[in-house]
């Protein structure tokens, strides 16, 4: 009995050692060889090291492995399909130049993958996540696709430190990063420029964090939320030089928009079509046609401690924007510091109003019946 137990213990140790060796295996693929053949031979946990060259194939990853490019090998799927499809959880893709004309550069239908330091171009979607969770997408250069990164029904992913530009090859629909029916994602510290309709678009997506992104020179919006994209946090982004709004909400509620910079847009921050119960706080909007614009039944929003400087209008409310609370804002050197054609908007909270560089003792807001009974005589520092 003791001999049998000892034999089983030795066998268990041997199995662990061989499993460890298998996890550490590295398979090298040279120019002219097949990456897919190496994937088929690999065991879970293996690393496939691909040397420089052009590989004309569409890869299917059906097991968790690391695929590493040396000196930026190119995967060109042509009309065959997506460049790489991740079916298995827990893979890592790094160091590739990925191109395809018909489909997606990297198509993810699995969880807990890492996609980093790749160049992806000339695709329908550069990277697409479809019902995929907890993936990390970082430090990629994604350019000249229809959409840079597209998430569909995908939650708890992190997209950070990517350079996403010129994703506008299809004029009907083009975005830098687009989310649909997706929640609890973190999108932060990306550089997005010249991405067609919008650099960062959320549709029917809730509880996402958009933080510290630099967004510029889009045909319509820098950041856009639509179709009940509710309860998102938009903070510390810089939206510059977009043809319409730096930040745009359409039919979206209970979002927090704070500490953003929006400058040189047609509108800095624009709420429209029943975008209600949002908080706009500590934003800096300057050199826009309208700094902050509320329209089309956008109601019950709170605008607090924002600075609007050198815009055509600092804060502009159209006739159907009502029951908004506006206080402790700094409206400085705008063509019109404030304009209110709405109804029942409050320009103070009963204790503090706003600072206007064209101050009167009681500030009657042009456009309608708006009155600030407690205007500040000096801006808060």
Range-by-range predicted roles:
Residues 77-85, 100-110, 122-132, 144-154, ...:
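Extracellular beta-strand/beta-solenoid scaffold signature
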Residues 46-49, 74, 299, 304, ...:
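Acidic, glycine- and Ser/Thr-rich low-complexity intrinsically disordered tracts
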Residues 10-19:
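Bacterial N-terminal signal peptides
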Residues 20-24:
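Sec/Tat signal peptide C-region and signal peptidase I cleavage site
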Residues 31, 52, 64-106:
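Right-handed parallel beta-helix/beta-spiral solenoid domain characteristic of secreted/periplasmic
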């Amino acid at each position: 009995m003791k001999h049998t137990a000892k034999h089983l213990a030795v066998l268990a140790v041997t199995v662990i050692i061989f499993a460890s060796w298998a996890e550490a295996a590295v398979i090298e693929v040279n120019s002219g060889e097949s990456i897919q053949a190496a994937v088929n031979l690999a065991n879970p946990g293996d690393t496939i090291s691909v040397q420089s060259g052009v590989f004309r194939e569409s890869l299917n990853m059906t097991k968790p492995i690391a695929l590493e490019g040396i000196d930026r090998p190119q995967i060109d799927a042509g009309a065959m399909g997506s460049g790489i499809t991740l079916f298995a959880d827990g893979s890592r893709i790094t160091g590739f130049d990925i191109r395809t004309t018909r489909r997606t550069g990297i198509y993810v239908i699995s969880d807990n993958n890492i996609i980093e330091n790749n160049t992806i171009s000339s695709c329908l979607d550069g990277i697409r996540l479809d019902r995929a969770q907890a993936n990390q997408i970082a430090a990629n250069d994604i350019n000249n696709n229809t959409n840079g990164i597209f998430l569909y029904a995908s939650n708890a992913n992190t997209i950070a430190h990517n350079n996403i530009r010129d994703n506008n090859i299809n004029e009907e629909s083009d975005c830098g990063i687009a989310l649909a029916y997706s929640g609890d994602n973190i999108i932060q510290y990306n550089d997005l420029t010249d991405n067609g309709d919008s650099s960062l678009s959320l549709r029917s997506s809730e509880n996402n964090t958009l933080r510290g992104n630099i967004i510029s020179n889009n045909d319509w919006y820098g950041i856009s939320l639509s179709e009940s994209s509710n309860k998102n946090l938009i903070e510390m982004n810089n939206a510059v030089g977009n043809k319409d709004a730096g930040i745009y909400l359409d039919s979206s509620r209970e979002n927090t928009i704070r500490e953003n910079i929006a400058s040189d847009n047609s509108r800095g921050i624009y709420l429209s079509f029943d975008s209600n119960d949002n908080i706009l706080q500590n934003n800096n909007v300057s050199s826009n046609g309208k700094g902050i614009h509320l329209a089309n039944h956008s109601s019950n929003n709170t605008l607090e401690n924002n600075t609007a400087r050198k815009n055509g209008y600092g804060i502009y409310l159209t006739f159907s924007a009502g029951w908004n609370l506006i206080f402790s804002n700094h409206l400085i050197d705008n063509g019109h510091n404030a304009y209110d054609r709405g109804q029942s908007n409050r320009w103070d909270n009963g204790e503090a109003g706003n600072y206007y560089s064209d101050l009167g003792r009681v500030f009657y807001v042009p456009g309608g019946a708006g009155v600030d009974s407690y205007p500040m005589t000096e801006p808060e520092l």
